[in-house]
Amino acid sequence: MSRPTSSRSSPAATAVDLLLPDPPRGTVSAVVFSPTPAAPHINALASSWDHRVHHYRINSSVSDSASTSTSDQDLVTKVQAFAHEAPVLDVCFITDTLAASASVDRRVRLLDLQTGKTLILGKHEDSLLKLRWCPQTQLLVSGSADRKLSFWNVSLEDPTKAGLFKTLDMPDKVIALDISPPFPLANGDSTPIYSASAPGKPHPRDPTPRLVVGMTGRHVFVYDLLPLHSAIDREQAGERVAERDWQPDQKRESSLKFMARDLRCMPSGDGYATSSIEGRIAVEFFDPNPKVQAMKYAFKCHRETVSEGADPLVVGVVEGEEEMETPYDVVYPVHGIAFHPK
């Protein structure tokens, strides 16, 4: 059976695409935008396998009224690049001027966008794969191939107190995690939002800060970060904390049969979506009520059906192997998913 080999080239840039000055020279692992973009600039960070986090500044005042005569240099400028000792697998914003990075060299770094300085917060025992910042609890969370989940004190007021708060053992490697809700609400903002749990019916967001952790072996843990943060505070104060206080609120098995590639929480705060290497996405909800759980679903995506005489993906057949019987599906891994804030 021959294995299809893609002969496609990347699509050409359109008139509305922006070409980044001095782009990353390796595979881009993550792209994030400043949490509270303020005119006239928006900060963007791109982590890469070229051992760097690249910092770009987007001129939003120009891009809003951009014309064909506006050059990319007027829209995007490269501010700096933060060098690491190994490929960088993830990056997240903490404030508009402070970010954190996850690297194969096992270290958790803080990146000061104003001064260009880097601070090593701590390290794991194996490659650091994912990290997220929870603004409600002021916790930085990191997940690693060492099967550990770590919570860090960034200490924005006193950098000398920054360091490790707590490390929890996981049953498998942490390959995905996210904070719910992913877009913090502004003070007093009660604008309804649409959710997959109630199609076509806007309802208030669930503001409960949760951490969703996806692992190899299809494990999914869900933590309520408010009681977890309280347990961390009690332990830091010298109090004894029961083992049950460190346990997740929910232990689940992924609806997807194959390993996850990404996990993102819904803006509504009531669920999350996961993607897999087998071209599928699953949508799940936190509420354990059977009626709510009955609404979870999964769907296929990023697939192409190849029929007889229409096989644009196969370049050639390896000698000695049989041709694949048509029709068949070419399945692509879903490496990344994202929700629009609204």
Q: Where is each model-derived feature located?
A:
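Beta-strand-rich domains and repeat architectures in extracellular enzymes and scaffolds
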Residues: 20-51
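WD40/WD-repeat beta-propeller blade N-cap
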Residues: 20-28, 72-75, 81-88, 122-129, ...
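Short coil/turn segments within WD40 beta-propeller repeats
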Residues: 26-29, 49-54, 86-89, 105-109, ...
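WD40/WD-repeat beta-propeller blade-loop signature
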Residues: 27, 40, 84-88, 98, ...
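Loop/turn segments within WD40 beta-propeller blades
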Residues: 31-41, 91-97, 131-138, 178-208, ...
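Beta-propeller domains
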Residues: 43-74
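Conserved beta-strand element within WD40/beta-propeller blades
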Residues: 44-48, 99-103, 140-144, 211-215, ...
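Short loop/turn segments immediately following beta-strands, especially the blade-tip
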Residues: 57-68, 154-159, 224-241, 283-296
